Amino acid sequence: MKLSDFDFDLPDDLIATRPAQPRSSARLLVARGDAISDAVVRDLPDWLRPGDRLVLNDTRVIPARLSGTRQRQSAQGPVTARIEITLLEPRADGSWSALAKPLRKLREGETIIFSNDLSADVEAIEDGQALLRFNLTGPDFDAALAQAGAMPLPPYIAAKRAADEQDKTDYQTVWARHSGAVAAPTASLHFDDTLLAALAAHGVTFTHVTLHVGAGTFLPVKVEDVTTHKMHAEWGRVSAEAAAEIAATKAAGGRVIPVGTTALRLIESAARGGQIAPWEGDTDIFIYPGFDFRVADGLMTNFHLPKSTLLMLVSALMGQESIRKIYAHAVENRYRFFSYGDASLLLPG
């Protein structure tokens, strides 16, 4: 299975840099087997059945991009340098792994000042990353980070514009609960309270799970034989209550439809024993054509990058030829792509 099998031409002007407003006004491509229909996200209840269950990732994106000043003492006095930090994940001991630009200007033992309230000591430089320990913890850290940090927009948006205050709302789901992600579960960005109420009135139920989306979600596949690709790991949890809800829906003949690839990867990780069960830990599950789905009966997701692991995932669900047709339709009909773009509802035949 070659990487080139998952390539397609995408006009640059189809990459969305702002989301649709209101959220549920984004377009929705519905693929049911070989049939393709054009719709709008707010019409999602029309495409689902009473008894269907949507699985929602309730991770909260932290404002993980920080700009600070490195302090260094020298014989000539204090020497400073501007440092850009992207937080990656917290360690068990309370420190944070982070990307730093330029990393070469940091040494162990130095301090980076981000604001009057927030600073971090450089504890180590390892594997191209900085290990930072902040001066604050808990709610105090969260509050200072909210003031000093910016949302970690995906690289294909950040290349076109800087993050701003609007992104702190736009790049967060309405049900975000557990802080820890450095990228949003973007299919979920299309939902607002009005749509959730309409779905509930239609008999659709919801289950919340947590997967903290990491920066590794944007890493390119660098091998031509995609089966040899090694996925990044992300922490997730499926509670006993969530597993029971999903199992009950399956037993009753309802469909389990994750909203977003993160929710899908998590519930399939929790079902490797054959059926859904409570689960917590790091998952590096890699879903590509030939994968045996145990839980997901469909998927709501945005449109993904060429040659990406997420394009491989949807190809596993729908079939490679079907996805080629779906994406050709999306490009021809000028759907907006990637994190702030339009959505698709994928229901295998």
Swiss-Prot record:
One of its GO terms (cellular component) is cytoplasm. Its main location: cytoplasm. InterPro entries: QueA, QueA_dom1, QueA_dom2, QueA_sf. The keyword Transferase applies. GO terms for molecular function: S-adenosylmethionine:tRNA ribosyltransferase-isomerase activity. Pathway: tRNA modification; tRNA-queuosine biosynthesis. This is S-adenosylmethionine:tRNA ribosyltransferase-isomerase.
